[in-house]
């Protein structure tokens, strides 16, 4: 029998009006209930979610429950078998037990069709993880016909066994606790289960413990579930749902929504969705989001505390788990991904304001983010393997290191080159070999002045990323990775729906003279033909006469022809970046000029023809005008990446909301917050983007509270001494404490006093004006041997 901890709906009958119980560490922002307009919008939202297929059928729900029961039976039999083999008494064999718990979206009740089930097996102390679970139990699963795609991940932050059982994806963790016999009614929320266990076991147990605490700390679980289901779908549509890539995962979104439910205990989902974007657009990161006080315990496990733990000070978007030991669930967030999420929150806030004015429908909020139209420059990471099984393991490893590439680029460019990793993978079905591709958008960070043409070097950055990836413990022949720079017009066709790229108005006339196959996969000779055509067209059209010609007085080298057996995928206009045998990896992009330096011993005939054609094109001039063409150059053994100031088009317009004009459809009275909060001033020029106030008498209280949200986000005064409970949501954890001092928001003990600054402004970490303070640190903490190449920058970012 599966543990009684499984998801129940006993709390779904909670009344709309919140009880007298207090939720969260602060008073709510508003206790008002929904208006008639809110109820109407809520019905429309729920209908939209059903029409989008976010709910599974009753048959599939029953099938999932049967699978969980079956897995519970399997682990019980496994533990009894181990107990007998180790010579325990018959009574011990009879009492031997293991219990299956669920967590994640399934436990919270927000899973959709085809979603996986996160499960935890809790076993006795004599059954270990390393041998008994990942070897003996794995062999049992491998012999079962119902089990497919079995993949143990032993080196993960939380070790997991991944497989499909009767077609349903299962993520199974294991935790061995200090009990000889596991009771069937084990209370996993009791801290005693954490006695005498290692940190990996604590992390495994905390998935279930956190899920239980979340459901206990929200005023209305059904409203929480609907809102969370909605916002998870929104995050996937907007490309910001992925913990491994540096965005937010399921537990992160659940904690953000739960905190919002505490702010508005009587709000219904349509209100909560709108207020989600309103609140988190104004939130002053890195002030933490917490559902309850951070408690310490005699077990002495480390808890999130930036005063004591040096590494906690570098967390950019702390979202703290409510179960002991409290941790930051969003430590993967980087400066670049925080910028992307902030822009998407602003997009959602703008759309929700228009929905409240009946100018937009809910479908507008869930528009697919057009990632491949947002930037001019991308990095393409191609992952190859010999067979499907190898690709599954290799792809997971490369994806887990993809976040490190973002951090390294931020580090080596001093935060001036921002990255936007795309969580999804793409496959070219026309290829015979096993592969997939990941992409990353590149954009110059806002707020950096200086030279009109500033250069950075990411050649060594890519090389360092390659070296780390190749340290994979389970590497096998055929596993390879290639990194390429591609411009928007050179993107391969397989990244677009049905292989079709939407038509787009070109910025320059020279871009209008393209061959139809410019975005697809082509040979080196095709690149030469397109190069010659673009060059001739540019000379005729004279599209950019004001631009200074670029010198190309460098010796030529060859680029090895791509094949599944050697170097991998070569896309038209896509030079290889350092993922080739030989010396250091090279990556060069100079405006429209894409260059790559390689030195290969075996020169293909086709490559020789390519060189000769390029040489002929250069004979008439030592200077030449380039437009999106590729050249193979050697530039003083250094490589360049240069692009223009308008590298990317804005994802969403930065709008600072006029809080005095925000629409709040509340029908009741608001309770006053019992402590003083500093107000904010908003630029009048920004008010044109927001709706006008409709009902001043009913809405003014909530508007004032939201205007003072900074007190909750960052303004609770700490008296300078440490108690047993860290019960404030406002301690200082910025990666750059200097910026906080300049804003005069710090006491001598390093804590925020007055919350938000006088004006809503970009976080210094987003604008890039703050120090990085070792922002590229990973869990393994890179040492001082890391290279900093920004002293001799080679990436040019020029104003157009």
Swiss-Prot record:
Compositional bias, Polar residues, is annotated for 564-575
Q: Which UniProt keywords apply?
A: ATP-binding, Cytoplasm, Magnesium, Metal-binding, mRNA processing, Nucleotide-binding, Nucleotidyltransferase, Nucleus, Repeat, Transferase
Per UniProt, where does Mg(2+) 2 bind?
Answer: 116, 118, 171
Q: Which residues bind Mg(2+) 1?
A: 116, 118
Please indicate if the UniProt record lists Cytoplasm as a keyword: yes
Chief localization:
nucleus
Return the Gene3D superfamilies for the record. Answer: 1.10.1410.10, Beta Polymerase, domain 2 (3.30.460.10), Poly(A) polymerase predicted RNA binding domain (3.30.70.590)
GO molecular-function terms, A-Z: ATP binding; metal ion binding; poly(A) RNA polymerase activity; RNA binding
- Pfam families xrefs: PAP_central, PAP_NTPase, PAP_RNA-bind
What intrachain disulfides are recorded?
none
Nuclear localization signal 1 (motif): residue ranges? 487-494
Q: Name one GO biological process term.
A: RNA 3'-end processing
Marked site: Interaction with RNA: 162, 332, 403, 408, 616
* Role description: Essential protein. Polymerase that creates the 3'-poly(A) tail of mRNA's. Also required for the endoribonucleolytic cleavage reaction at some polyadenylation sites. May acquire specificity through interaction with a cleavage and polyadenylation specificity factor (CPSF) at its C-terminus. Mediates the polyadenylation of RNAs that are associated with polynucleotide phosphorylase (e.g. PNP1).
- Tell me the protein family, please: Belongs to the poly(A) polymerase family.
Q: By what name is this protein known?
A: Nuclear poly(A) polymerase 2
Organism annotation: Arabidopsis thaliana (Mouse-ear cress)
Gene for this chain = PAPS2
């Amino acid at each position: 029998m599966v543990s009684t901890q499984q998801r129940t709906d006993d709390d779904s009958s909670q009344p709309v009006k919140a009880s007298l119980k207090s939720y969260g560490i602060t008073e709510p922002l508003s206790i008002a209930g929904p208006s008639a307009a809110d109820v109407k919008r809520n019905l429309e939202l729920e209908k939209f979610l059903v029409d989008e297929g976010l709910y599974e059928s009753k048959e599939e729900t029953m099938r999932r429950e049967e699978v969980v029961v079956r897995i519970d039976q399997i682990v019980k039999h496994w533990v009894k078998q181990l107990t007998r083999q180790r010579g325990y008494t018959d009574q011990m064999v009879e009492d031997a037990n293991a219990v299956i718990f669920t967590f994640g979206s399934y436990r919270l009740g927000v899973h959709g069709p085809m979603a996986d089930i996160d499960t935890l097996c809790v076993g006795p102390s004599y059954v270990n993880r390393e041998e008994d679970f990942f070897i003996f139990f794995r062999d049992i699963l491998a012999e079962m016909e119902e089990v497919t795609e079995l993949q143990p991940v032993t080196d993960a932050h939380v070790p997991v066994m991944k497989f499909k059982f009767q077609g349903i994806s299962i993520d199974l963790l294991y935790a061995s606790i200090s009990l000889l016999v596991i009771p069937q009614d084990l209370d996993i929320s009791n801290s005693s289960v954490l006695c005498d266990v290692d940190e990996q076991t604590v992390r495994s147990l905390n998935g279930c413990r956190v899920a239980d605490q979340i459901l206990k700390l929200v005023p209305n679980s059904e409203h929480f579930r609907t809102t969370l289901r909605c916002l998870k779908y929104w995050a996937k549509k907007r490309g910001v749902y992925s913990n491994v890539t540096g965005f937010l995962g399921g537990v992160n979104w659940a904690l953000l929504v739960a905190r919002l439910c505490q702010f508005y205990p009587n709000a219904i989902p349509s209100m909560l969705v709108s207020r989600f974007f309103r609140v988190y657009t104004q939130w002053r990161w890195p002030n933490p989001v917490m559902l309850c006080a951070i408690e310490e315990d005699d077990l002495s496990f480390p808890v999130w505390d930036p005063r004591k733990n040096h590494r906690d000070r570098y967390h950019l978007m702390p979202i703290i788990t409510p179960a002991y030991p409290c941790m930051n669930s969003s430590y993967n967030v980087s400066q670049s991904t925080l910028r992307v999420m902030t822009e998407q929150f602003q997009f959602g806030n703008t759309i929700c304001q228009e929905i409240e004015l009946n100018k937009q429908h809910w479908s507008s909020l869930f528009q697919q983010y057009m990632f491949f139209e947002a930037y001019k420059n991308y990095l393409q990471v191609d992952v190859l393997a010999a067979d499907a099984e190898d690709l599954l393991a290799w792809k997971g490893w490369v994806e887990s290191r993809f976040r490190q590439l973002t951090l390294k680029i931020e580090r080596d460019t001093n935060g001036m080159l921002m990255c936007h990793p795309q969580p999804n993978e793409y496959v070219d079905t026309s290829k015979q070999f096993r592969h997939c591709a990941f992409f990353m958008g590149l954009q110059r960070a806002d707020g950096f002045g200086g030279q009109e043409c500033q250069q950075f070097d990411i050649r060594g950055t890519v090389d360092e990323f390659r070296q780390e990836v190749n340290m994979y413990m389970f590497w096998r022949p055929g596993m390879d990775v290639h990194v390429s720079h591609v411009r928007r017009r050179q993107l391969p066709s397989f990244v677009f729906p049905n292989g079709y790229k939407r038509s787009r108005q070109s910025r320059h006339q020279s871009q209008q003279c393209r061959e139809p196959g410019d975005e697809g996969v082509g040979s080196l000779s095709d690149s030469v033909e397109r190069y010659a055509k673009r060059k001739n067209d540019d000379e005729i059209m004279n599209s950019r006469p004001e631009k200074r010609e670029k010198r190309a007085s460098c010796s030529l080298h060859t680029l090895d022809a791509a094949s599944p057996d050697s170097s991998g995928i070569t896309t038209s206009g896509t030079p290889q970046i350092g993922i080739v045998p030989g010396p250091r990896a090279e990556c060069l992009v100079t405006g429209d000029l894409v260059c790559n330096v390689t030195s290969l011993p075996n020169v293909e005939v086709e490559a020789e023809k390519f060189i000769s054609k390029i040489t002929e094109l250069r004979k008439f001039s030592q200077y030449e005008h380039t437009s999106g063409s590729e050249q193979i150059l050697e530039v003083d053994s250094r490589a360049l990446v240069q692009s223009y100031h308008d590298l990317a088009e804005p994802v969403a317009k930065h709008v600072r909301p006029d809080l005095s004009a925000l629409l709040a459809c509340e029908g009741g009275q608001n309770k006053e917050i019992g402590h003083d909060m500093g107000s904010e001033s908003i630029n009048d020029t920004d008010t044109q983007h927001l709706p006008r106030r409709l009902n001043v008498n009913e809405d003014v209280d909530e508007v004032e509270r939201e205007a003072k949200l900074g007190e909750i986000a960052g303004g609770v005064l700490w008296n300078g001494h440490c108690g047993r409970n860290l019960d404030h949501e406002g301690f200082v954890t910025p990666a750059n404490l200097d910026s906080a001092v300049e804003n005069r928001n710090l006491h001598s003990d390093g804590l925020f006093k007055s919350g938000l600054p006088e004006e809503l402004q970009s976080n210094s970490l987003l604008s890039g004006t703050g120090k990085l303070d070792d922002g590229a640190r990973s869990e393994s903490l890179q040492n001082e041997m890391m290279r900093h190449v920004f002293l001799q920058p080679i990436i040019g970012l020029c104003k157009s």
